[in-house]
Amino acid sequence: MTAFRLILLMCFAEALSMAGFSAVPALLPVLQNTWHLSAWQAGVLGGSYFAGYVVSISWLSSLTDHVDARRVFLLGTALAGLGSLGFYFLAHDLVSACLFQAVTGAGLAGTYMPGLRALTDRIETSLQPRFIAFYTSTFGIGASLSYAFSGWVGTAYGWPAAFCLAGILPLLAGLLVWRLLPAQHPVPHPRLSMFKTQWVALKNAEIRRHVLGYCAHCWELFGFRAWIVALLTYAGTQSELPLSATAIAALVNLFGIPASILGNEAAIRGDRHRHILRVMLASGVLAWLTGFFASTPWLLIAVLPVYFAAIMADSAALTAGLVASTNAQNRGSAMAVYSLGGFGAGFIAPVMVGVLLDLAGGQKSALAWLLACGSLGVWCLVLATHTLWKRFAPSPIT
């Protein structure tokens, strides 16, 4: 298979496998009303997807050091499909919904990084960083399509129908990869315990820097994606929106695709660490600006694409930097640690946003939305400020 066909196949399969990714955020106001959920309970529901990811990623990603990543990807599509179908057939309250969301999140753990591993194992060329950028930016396409289809199907046929569709499409992705992606036998490496290999990877300072950056990135990204529809729904109570909240959310997510690709190009052509630092500072400031405009729909709609582009401008740069700092023997373990940290933050962020909303006056309070949105960028600002302090702090006088 040519490199072009390979990247096309894996990007298409990734987008299909993510059909359930934004289903809960897109339908969160409906689910809150149906099951009478508070903001923090809604945050738990949104975060349970990433809890399933975190529980599964260490094993599934590390497994790609020993078996063909294609096989792990197929397992992931099965979990993603079964989780959403289980939500369709059996979810009836917060606990059951969280359970099936966790299964769906485990499916992402089996598709996203293992899919990237399947790609990088088959493309060892100087173009690899660009292929990585295309693959990681497809995450945004999958998220946008999930928002759009979940919102449209949920509005037209009811929320259960949206989860039914979200369960079918990952199974189709698995079928395509099973039929079209050639199997590959990985080079055998000495078998060490999963935790030992991940600890060895984490002791690498370059890997550790990328993991910390990814934690801050995912805190902001997944907190934003979990609550953007609810934020726009609040804005719509202040003044009429030009489109539905889910349609605007889907369009905003599309801005992340060119931002991720162009951000990686900037990192390749310049200083990667400096690029990531600038992006984190920008997104941290824009997080507070987004919250400030929450009660002014037109200004909010204007700033959201800029903010989301800033969130995504370091995504591919971080991932490509991680891959560049690993070798074939430890890449799976490094990806496991990287994903565990990032998606662990992605699990906590939606919950913390919900807690802040409840504590600061609820989802009808402008102050609550200011604090909630500002909290999304706090770790990017902390990390960037710490890096700048280390770089420019005066040496102690002796």
Regions found by a protein language model. Give the residues of each.
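C-terminal ends and interior cores of transmembrane alpha-helices
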Residues: 78-92, 282-295
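Cytoplasmic membrane-interface "Motif A"-like loop-to-helix N-cap segments
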Residues: 66-76, 268-281
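C-terminal transmembrane helical hairpin of 12-TM major facilitator-type secondary transporters
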Residues: 273-318
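Extracytoplasmic gate region of multi-pass secondary transporters
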Residues: 24-25, 208-253
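Conserved MFS/SLC helix-loop-helix module at the cytosolic interface between two early adjacent transmembrane helices
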Residues: 55-91
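Helix-to-loop junctions at the C-terminal end of transmembrane segments
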Residues: 56-68, 259-272, 357
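Helix-loop-helix hairpin linking two adjacent transmembrane segments in secondary transporters
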Residues: 135-181
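Cytoplasmic helix-loop-helix junction between adjacent transmembrane helices
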Residues: 100-138
